[in-house]
């Protein structure tokens, strides 16, 4: 039986016909597939996926839950189909601060209680040159990645951009060396109005970096909303893709909107078709985390009123992405 929540999700998912260069899915066919997937639930999607060598590996971003108690967030991670947590600080959340308040030992105990592992410490507040202390904390608590934005002039193009990216990598080398020593990966997000904010900048970062301990945390939100372009960016950088945000522009995230419009940042709710994107992830055999993501307005609040509702939205996106992947699989010859 389809729940009322699933019925509402289905109406949103079926609101537009999905078309790509890879295949065309008409509204009726897509909706019928989605009905079957929703009735079966995530378990059936996972079963069909198990037959394939490629799977999306999910991580939960704590900022999706705003400033809720960390225990309430950790209790939802497994329900959201994940095993790892990405911890965010103020002003998007305050879970990094909550860890310091409770102490590292208590945090480790709560992780164990809920059978969750630390994956990432996100720190746009510190910037890429201020992450070494957090690398040590991540290592101590079992994490393997820190994420930040880039530093350098924005709005550059051509050779000026290439030179600035090369200079940024040179400045990052001591931090890359520290990351290598600790076994921590540094993810740099492509963020609007920053040095690394375009496909060219992303490709040059991938070209100039040793990749293993520094790579791109790719945010489709901050790129042109062209799934084929985003897919090409993914295949171009290959194993320099270290993190993927399942996130689109939708109606944006800078002004207060009705909730249903705000949620259009989520894959499956907005207009962008993610089939070419997951196809590209499969093509490069992407093994990093996929983080279902959006920004609420104002920052620091949960994307939905309750933790269970936040998790439901995350699972709706997971169902959509798995359906996109199944469409890619169906078109691939055995």
What are the functions of these language-model segments?
Residues 61-65, 88-90, 123-126, 151-152, ...:
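Active-site beta-loop-alpha junctions enriched in small/polar residues
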Residues 56-62, 85-87, 118-122, 146-148, ...:
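Hydrophobic faces of well-ordered beta-strands that scaffold small-molecule active sites
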Residues 4-5:
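Basic polycationic patches enriched in arginine
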Residues 8-25, 31-41, 45-57, 68-80, ...:
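Histidine-acidic metal/acid-base catalytic patches
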Residues 87-106, 156:
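Glycine-rich, proline-tolerant flexible connector loops at the mouths of alpha/beta enzymes
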Residues 90-92, 97, 124, 255-262:
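Vicinal oxygen chelate
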Residues 34-40, 52, 72, 78, ...:
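Active-site acidic/histidine proton-transfer and metal-coordination neighborhood
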Residues 92-96, 154-159, 225, 298-303:
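A short acidic, helix-capping loop that chelates divalent metal ions and anchors anionic groups
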């Amino acid at each position: 039986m389809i729940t009322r929540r699933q019925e509402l999700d289905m109406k949103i998912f079926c609101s537009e016909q999905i078309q790509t260069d890879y295949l065309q899915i008409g509204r009726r066919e897509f909706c019928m597939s989605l009905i079957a997937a929703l009735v079966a639930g995530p378990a059936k999607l996972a079963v069909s996926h198990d037959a394939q060598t490629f799977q999306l590996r999910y991580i939960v971003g704590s900022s999706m839950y705003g400033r809720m108690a960390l225990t309430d967030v950790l209790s939802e991670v497994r329900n959201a189909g994940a095993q790892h947590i990405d911890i965010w600080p103020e002003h998007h959340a305050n879970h990094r601060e909550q860890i310091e308040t409770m102490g590292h030992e208590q945090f480790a105990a709560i992780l164990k209680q809920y059978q969750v592992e630390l994956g990432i410490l996100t720190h746009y507040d510190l910037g890429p040159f201020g992450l070494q202390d957090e690398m040590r904390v991540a290592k101590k608590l079992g994490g393997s990645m820190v994420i930040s934005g880039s530093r350098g002039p924005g709005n550059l193009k051509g050779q000026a951009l290439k030179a600035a990216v090369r200079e940024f990598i040179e400045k990052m080398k001591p931090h890359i060396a520290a990351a290598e020593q600790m076994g921590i990966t540094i993810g740099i997000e492509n963020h609007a109005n920053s040095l690394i904010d375009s496909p060219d900048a992303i490709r040059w970062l991938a070209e100039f970096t040793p990749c293993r301990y520094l790579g791109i945390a790719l945010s489709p939100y901050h790129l042109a909303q062209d799934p084929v372009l985003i897919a090409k960016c993914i295949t171009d950088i290959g194993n320099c893709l270290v993190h993927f945000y399942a996130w689109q522009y939708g109606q944006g995230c800078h002004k207060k909107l009705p909730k249903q419009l705000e949620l259009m940042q989520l894959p499956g709710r907005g207009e962008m078709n993610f089939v070419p994107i997951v196809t590209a992830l499969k093509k490069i055999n992407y093994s990093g985390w996929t983080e279902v993501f959006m920004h609420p307005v104002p920052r620091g609040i949960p994307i939905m009123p309750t933790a269970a509702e936040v998790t439901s939205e995350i699972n709706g996106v997971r169902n959509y992405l798995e359906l996109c992947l199944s469409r890619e699989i169906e078109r691939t010859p055995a």
